[in-house]
UniProtKB/Swiss-Prot annotation:
It is an enzyme of class 2 (transferase). Keywords: Transferase. Belongs to the deoxyhypusine synthase family. Its EC number is 2.5.-.-. It comes from the Bacteria. InterPro entries: Deoxyhypusine_synthase (IPR002773), Deoxyhypusine_synthase-like (IPR023496), Deoxyhypusine_synthase_sf (IPR036982), DHS-like_NAD/FAD-binding_dom (IPR029035). This is Deoxyhypusine synthase-like protein. One of its GO terms (cellular component) is cytoplasm. GO terms for molecular function: deoxyhypusine synthase activity.
Amino acid sequence: MAKHLGKKIAPIPMSTDISVVDLIDNYFTAYNSARLREASQLLACDILKDGVTVGVSLSGAMTPAGFGVSALAPLIRNGFIDWMISTGANLYHDMHYGLGFELFAGNPFLDDVKLREEGTIRIYDIIFGYDVLLETDAFIRKILQAEPFQKRMGTAEFHYLLGKYVREVEKQLGVKHSCLLATAYEYGVPIYTSSPGDSSIGMNVAALALEGSQLILDPAIDVNETAAIAYNAREGEGKSAAVILGGGSPKNFLLQTQPQIHEVLGLEERGHDFFVQFTDARPDTGGLSGATPAEAVSWGKIDPDELPSTIVCYTDSTIALPLVTAYVLNQCPPRPLKRLYDRREELYDKLRTDYLAAKDKPVEKVATNGEVATYPCGTPIRQ
């Protein structure tokens, strides 16, 4: 039994002046509280170091609850998030705060028919006026008519421009705490969305297309830029971390950077070094949201040698994010900003150059003199 023993569970009564670090380190002793503790400590001790590139995926209705302003923006300011994948809905509802609109605590058991008649929108226990949607839509359509948007672009550039305009509104209105989009713009953190048409932002882009807008959001740009970020993360002694809030398409878009590198582009890559997920999704239904780090190893998304550095905490992200944010803000000094948005073209060109060079090599290595035949990425071909 001795080899399985961890830290002894020695409970002591809580004090009236307990800190969040003390709470997590000493009272989150088992089950998913222990997983949250392990995730917090892994972030503080290993992930949030200068040589690690941290990608965060965001799904679920997190920004309507204010977490874009209260948690994600501070993490960006401290250099703890280098790039992001988000649902479009999270970025859309984040804009409400930047534009000075109001959202309120409500009740999940309100009469939704009456709410519709009153012009009130409900997101579980959050409520706000229908006019918030209309005014946000009007703002989006107005700025998307500007010249910088009249071209083909990826979603990182698109969100950077959105954040720029939202930040100007924040300044004019005197908004005290910037929203996620505006903060990412200021700190050079690229934000991608894996499904740009699947939100009110994309719906407004589509409406303007009917009017002749030249804006085209190109998913190929996003796939290659995100792969380039992951590819560059391993330069020198660097490492790559995937921190996943929820699951869904953003989770896959963050993790698929590795198969894009080795499976599709034929470049050598071993997977992300760190994997931390907060989710309420089960693994046994086969969906990506609940897929475990061990399963991701089979796809080449996670380095098998780094499985001990992977943690899944089964909990609501609205519980985990504020706790973990408070923990790392207390435990970790700010990191230098990577400003990966400003380096997109440089990283893209490096990936493209290496890919084209690899393409000139034989499609697969033929085994001779006892050698093992391999695929272009170096994976052995099993007979």
